[in-house]
Amino acid sequence: MKRLGLYGVAAAFMLAGALFSSCQLFQKPTGDGEAEAADTLVVEAFTYIDTASVISCHVYQRLAVDFPLPGDSTVLADSLREWFASAVEEHYMPLLGDETEPFRFSGDRSNMAELVKAAGEAGVERMSDELKLMAGEGFETEYNNDFEAKLGYQTDRFVTIETKYDIYTGGAHGAWIYKAATFRCRDGAAMGWNMLDLNQKDKIIALIKEGIKEYVSSSDNEVKTDEQLFECLMLWDDPDTPENELEFGLPLPATPPCLLSNGMFFCYQQYEIAPYALGLPMVTVPYDVIAPLLSAEGRELLDLK
């Protein structure tokens, strides 16, 4: 097995085996398109990249994670450190079967440089071991695992982290997972559906439905009606789904919403409601539109009276 790996401080243009960190001050956009310095969270960016060749098969591994600075001892920073560490442990390699033991970092989980390096190495090793078996049977394929967890948007009341997980383990195409998590600054609590008044679930679904119509529309095929929309989607009858969620079969997304610069963001994962060709159906509902449907927690995050 041929391995390429280099650990230490490296320039961004290095293609194989790099572990590097840089201090980044993220900025938040203002209403006029300008930007002001963020006053909530400063992060370091840690990236692991490695490749391996196993006879006729190949492995690519990339883990890229933002992490609060070591000197930040706020409850928000502590909450995010634990969240980032768990995310790296969960996504260090493609899902290769139920028999795969989860990776658990035995060192200091607040040391993201060492955690990312250990997780990256473990992922390359496990993918290589499986590909060795496949190569021995004459298969030519590759495993790609690309995970990113980045600071997406922040205010003095909340911070949103975005994660993107791109995996390929052979076959016609890979898989892409997008998730985001919003954290309340004052206590580091992770927020999700509790930002909305779910007693108004039918109105929330109605807003999402209108956004999905726009998402699936094209220049020569505008989707206006519910009937047109559901001809594009791929839905299943689920006996466990409450009756009030079954209007034309559209449920709330399995992934909780998050707060971004231009509104509340909703995202369905691949195959959740649509065929692969439609990707990840996603909707951003502007804050002035979603405001009447917010819970007390959601209104607090957006500083709404």
Model features per residue range: what roles?
Residues 19-22:
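C-terminal motif of bacterial Sec signal peptides marking the signal peptidase cleavage site
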